[in-house]
Amino acid sequence: MRMSTKDPKVFFITPPFTQLNTPYPATAYLKGFLNTKGIAAYQADLGLEVILQLFSTNGLKNLFAHIENSSKKLNENGQRMLRLKQSYIRTIDPVISFLHDKNPTLAHVIAEQNYLPEASRFQQVSDLEWAFGSMGVRDKARHLATLYLEDISDLIIDAVDPHFGFSRYAERLGRSASSFQELNRALHAPLTYIDELLVKTLEAKILQEKPDLVAITAPFPGNLYSALRCGQWIKKHHPEIKVAFGGGYANTELRSLQEPRVFEFVDFITLDDGETPLINLLEHLKGTRELKDLKRTFCCIDGTVTYLNGSKDPDVKQKDVGIPDYTDLPLDKYLSVIEIANPMHRLWSDGRWNKLTLAHGCYWGKCTFCDISLSYIKDYEATTAPMLVDRIEAMIAQTGNNGFHFVDEAAPPALMRDVALEIIRRDLTVVWWTNIRFEKSFTKDLCQLLVRSGCIAVSGGLEVASDRLLELIDKGVTVAQVAEVADHFTQAGILVHAYLMYGFPTQTAQETVDSLEVVRQLVENGVMHSGFWHQFALTAHSPVGLNPDAYQIQILNPEPGSFANNDLEHADPTGTDHALFSEGLKKSLFNYMHGIGLDMPLQDWFDFKIPRTQIPKNYIKRILAPSAEQMPKPNAKIVWLGPVPTIGKSSRGKTILQMSMGRDEVELLVPEKLGSWLVVTLDQLAVGPGKTWIFEEFEKEYAKAGLGEFAVFWEGATVEELREMGLLVI
């Protein structure tokens, strides 16, 4: 064991590829935590750096030269692109600069469609004026520039490297890799074209930083191969450096690891939250902790994979994890792209979002398809709103960016409410979106509060859009509830994305078709803006995987492999042939998101006979019909987000309350005594440093003022107008 009096220097790596528009947050989270311990760390997004090298003038010159010198036979599209190579080489640097938001005037020539070379991706371009409007020049140009990059990506996949993808690399090798054999074979093959760029970039960083420990995060199967390539290079060329591996892939797939060959590429593999395992590992490298006393860490001892968990140190509480630190990452070099012309869908690829977690784990933690037995779901721990907003302020100061994506499994409504109040209380400008459950806590008023604090969008699981299956999933919601909550968000001006699932055990063809009809009606009624269908995947750590008999399925690969063990093959004898529906579901939704085909028969999306839907044509419309509101609960919070009113003219026992709203001057005619009471009371209800009132107090103050029957007042026109202006019960 190396003995040293100083802390080892850490180098965090995100390997290719994750997102083009914003950093994956794992390394920033861990760097922020190490800051609290005074430990030096450096981080790099090697995926971004490889992309920027590849998509540059020199990068394309080298790429086209490589293609011309190879014996690979190109398809017709590739041959066209080769003929247009000078146009690609000439335009690539200006386009990348435009996607960095540094060359905005280029939008005008891109949008005219006579500047960029066009290959097969542009065949999908239809009515861009309809999609972006006559004034949406920059967005239209960003979409066209994205298609241009995707054309080049297609050429790379066809002619150079079939593993390439903008947000993943060699993903197939990481999926369901119960055996390490194929991945090991690929890692011992000569470096690919992309590998060459990767290791060149990695080597420069290693020589620059001279770390003692390289910690590689692999959140997804599409990062695994590159992560191990990085480890392989380091261990071969810099054997004095230790390599640790962790992240989402290890947490879900490698919990029963027995494969010693993986330790040719890394020295340590850690599971679950990384803070304490990392600190313990650094103590070990420093010589102050025995190997056996590491936390949730695999290593290879005498040729045998050994799980080390002798540490008595607890996991770090959320209040102590520190502030995510994006230092070292070139935040101005990320590429904002628009893959499809949909305002909600673009959030995943357009804009630089600071990532932050409101609460660790999932407060619901019951969904039967989910890995609820694993720490990242089951160990729920919230942070306080003031501390979260302290972190928001610090990250805005650090990055110069006020856009946030709260990356919770499902953000808790009560905490969202408190964070929104704290943002408003501090008078901050924040733009944010997050993942939610469509639960009844999201009332109209709460959604209005969220939008006032800067919320622009939410994403959540509708999953199977069938009440029987939602109950089987233990989702805790119904289709009607999802529709109502989505409507509340939409009425407030918040975009809604739904995660959709097909192929859950026992799902019939009829239920699949009915789910599609529900989705069609949600889009048609304007309460769902985008969605994504994925086929149910059985995992070993989910309730379904742990108890398959209860869901009438048969596991086909029950014996665990030596490497990855999470995805399970299964047979669903009582369900339909789920794979048959895949193309039709995805094709219909893609069109619905563009406002196309909403009046087409469902049968038209499929090339085989499907059952007629049993969902009434007005099913969602009926659910969304207005209904009488209940009197608020006594302990509900009540706040005023509008301006403090002033008293205008008074005559004949009536007075005019005047308020300057953002766009309008509003006058409210009320009884004189009520007007005086409202001026004082609304000021006290305003979100500020004082305590927040509850509804019971509001009612008592009204009664104390002797203003008449409260129910009549609350259900009357005055309160109706005040609620539209910002009197919210939350």
Q: Where do the protein language model's features map onto the residues?
A:
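Generic beta-strand/beta-sheet core signal
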Residues: I13, A44, T217, A244-G246, ...
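Radical SAM enzyme core and accessory elements
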Residues: R2-P15, N35-T36, V50-R168, L187, ...
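N-terminal [4Fe-4S]-dependent radical SAM core
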Residues: L183-A186, T306-K355, V666-L668, L728-I730
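A structural motif corresponding to the C-terminal lobe/cap of the Radical SAM core domain
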Residues: P8-T18, A26, L46-I51, F55, ...
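Radical SAM [4Fe-4S] cluster-binding motif and immediate context
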Residues: P324-A492
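Flexible loop/turn segments at secondary-structure boundaries
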Residues: T18-N21, V50-I51, P221-Y225, N251-E253, ...
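Glycine-rich beta-alpha loop elements in corrinoid/cobalamin-binding modules
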Residues: K9, F17-L20, P25-G59, S70, ...
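Non-catalytic positions within long, well-ordered alpha-helices that form the structural scaffold/packing
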Residues: L207, R261-V262, I396-A397, V451, ...
